[in-house]
Amino acid sequence: MSQLAMLGGPRVRSRPFPDWPIFGDAEETRLVRTLRSGRWGRLDGGEVDEFERRFAEMHGCAHGVAVVNGTVALRVALLAAGIRAEDEVIVPPYTFVSTASAVVEANAVPVFADVDPKTFNLDPSAVAAAVTSRTKAIIPVHFAGQPADMRALAAIANERKLLLIEDAAHAHGSSYAERAAGSLGDMATFSFQSSKNLTCGEGGIITTNDAPLADACRSIQNCGRVPDGLWYEHHVISGNYRLGEFQGAVLNSQLDRLEEQTRRRDANGQRLASRICALPGVHPQARPAECTRHSYHLFMLRLESAVFGAPRRAVLRALDAEGIPCSGGYGFSLPRQPLFRDKAFGPYLVNASTRLDYSMARCPASDLLCEQAIWLGQNVLLGSREDMDDIARAFEKLYEHRHELTAAVRC
């Protein structure tokens, strides 16, 4: 192949990948209709109500409770589940900080159980080892859009009488054993932040098939009100976490696009994985048979630099030069974050601070992923089959020129 682009050679591709978000007349029509209605808040309009029903049904659930963002969705779910001071909640170390910080905001204790370095999801054996008499819930993250090992995690939860709350922020439209993500535990939370596969800029939702849990979520979402109570009658400590009608309007239109986009991402993700998995040291996220649909919020792989023949930092720079947008993801796992390493719980769990020392946490698989992971964003997977072949050719080109690549980084 030709010389590396970062050394003056031609790029593998010069065309951009699809922009994100994707929108059109449908979004504009709903937004203008909402604007002209004068019903901009959740209490007055019908867009959010419609979206809650549609999204819950699409994800195999009877109830959906929309909130202002995915972090709040996690916090509301934990409070609705009855998580209280110093309860322990098991979370993965390789995830966005909100999975654990929401536990802290609920006045509970996040306990880190390591991930499987092949799937990037919670390792059930690590979860089982982390359960104590204080444990009340497990939060598996469907990382990159691939459902966690829910059969094994559900068995642990059932045996120990624990709640199972899915963090499905990446998993809109994913499925496990033909069941939709979001319907696999007691509750699930989703995010509609700008980068997500379904977005309105900022937003979130809780899904469940448990009516009492749904009622509790709605009360916490709506200032502690209850259906039969007076307007200025408040039953629980909460806040106003209601999603607005403009966000609901965008989400309803975006939801119409989700099925086709998810099919495309899944097909392209599988094609790309099949093309690059034969390269030495390149390990795409392993896909168990139970993953019957992968939404691919991210296409993830692990790069063994010693086997591939070039360091990850050089590969990331070279891929970008070849026209392939990518990143290394998290720089360190959650126990290494200053929030947990230095501050533990700040003003929250003062009494627990003396027995918590996250500097001693051992999460070798998560730490390895922070050193080896390469991420491609979901919009890349909305391209064509030929676009996936371009990405594969870029990896092949880098492997062919691995020695020049390593030398260039040393200079």
Regions found by a protein language model. Give the residues of each.
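Active-site PLP attachment segment
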Residues: 183-225, 245-248
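N-terminal "arm"/small-domain region of PLP-dependent enzymes with the aminotransferase-like
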Residues: 1-41, 376-377
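Conserved active-site segment immediately N-terminal to the catalytic lysine
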Residues: 166-200, 229-235
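PLP-dependent aminotransferase-like
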Residues: 79-168, 175
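Phosphate-binding glycine-rich loop
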Residues: 41-88, 102-104, 111-114, 179
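PLP-dependent aminotransferase class I/II
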Residues: 50-53, 62, 125, 137-141, ...
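Structural detector of well-ordered beta-strand residues that form the stable sheet scaffold
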Residues: 65, 90, 111, 164-165, ...
